[in-house]
Amino acid sequence: AVLLKDGKVCVAIEKERITRIKHDGGNDSDAIQYCLDAEGIALKDITVVVQCENFTLPKRDFFKGKRLFADSNQPKIIDISHHLAHAYSAVGTSPFSDCNVMVIDGCGSPLDQFIELHPEQKNSIEASFFEINQMQCEKDSFYHFDGQKLTPLIKDFSVMAEQTSSKFQLPTTQHSIGGFYASISNYVFGDMDDVGKLMGLAPF
């Protein structure tokens, strides 16, 4: 969770830092409450929440319990795609006021969910993707940042690949550099989320 005030980061925390469980996910209430407590404010003081709720599935408790603001229509909640969240994270800590952003990911938001979230960006996607009946997810995205807004230039989607039962798993999306990197992580360390460790080996 990250708390912003007037466009500046006030406090940020990964849930795993609180629970001491590596890659801890699901319910985000602990991380949100930490940020509120750090600034001495309450939920009512928040204007808007921006989130990336990937792979929304019916009848599934994705958040593993009631969220901090589950019983209220305040603050306003805005959903954005997985790759757009990555892109804003990059420009938010970048010194550039005008730049291009490239996101290369193992697996981002599904195509149908992306269109539902950002219908105005449909023209950034090649028409042939809409002719494929299989599930497709964000693979590569290219944006332009003008100091205020991120505009998608090109978005590439890929069909989800079948996972194998062998130790060397296929990427989550076909033809994905990010997915391939995660698969190598799984081969070396037995976990597709250990890409940071794999990156740490690079100098050696």
Each PLM stretch: what is its role?
Residues V2-F204:
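Short acidic/glycine-rich loops and adjacent helix/strand connectors
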